[in-house]
Amino acid sequence: RKEVADPTGFRRVSLTCEDILSEGDEFFVRCKNKPKEFRPHPIAISVPEKLSLIHTDVGVNLVGSGGGLRLIDWQCPAVGDICEDIYSFLSPAFQILGERPQLSGEQIKSFWDTLDRPDLARRYSKLRAAFAWRFAGYCAWRAEILDDTDICGRYRFALSAELKYMEDFV
């Protein structure tokens, strides 16, 4: 249903690989302990013809099931690429930070089979590493600035999972 919502008036998020990667760079530059992993190369990809109202934190904000499934907690809505919401659902770091298990390969395959949108699957495959780089940067930064050792540990675990998720696709 959110796909038919008019996104006019909401903040606009980055839409190109280079811009998304640059946002990750901005997080990593603040960190003392930078990962040894390499920055993905930007892939040329056109901006979607239709921009969407996106949630930006889907994974842990779905309640209900089937036709009653709802997105709650709309703290950071934006105008952007629907693939960003797909990313926040599939990302291992988002799941870890939400204190949920990472999705299995079988669950991810089931997601794509159920969605039945090969066009989005292709687009996502081009953007995934950039989204993962940006969120890995966020996790690295948060792991360094927070005081709670348990939460910092969760961010470090999320960082390592996200870098692996990025590498699996680069």
Protein language model features and the residues they cover:
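Active-site acidic catalytic loop and adjacent metal/ATP-binding pocket
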Residues: R39-E84
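Short amphipathic alpha-helical signal-transduction/dimerization elements
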Residues: R1-K2, F94, D116, E167
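Active-site catalytic-loop/activation-segment of kinase and kinase-like phosphoryl-transfer enzymes
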Residues: R1-A44
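Short amphipathic alpha-helical segments and their helix-coil junctions
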Residues: F38-R39, G67-L71, G105-R123, E162-F169
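Active-site activation/catalytic loop segments of kinase-like enzymes and analogous catalytic loops
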Residues: C83-D119, A129-D148
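Short, solvent-exposed segments of well-ordered alpha helices
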Residues: E49, P77-G80, Q95, L120-L127
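Surface-exposed helix-capping loop/turn segments at secondary-structure junctions
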Residues: K2-R11, D119-L120, I145-L146, V170
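ATP/Mg2+ or Mg2+-diphosphate-binding catalytic cores
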Residues: S22-K32, F135-V170
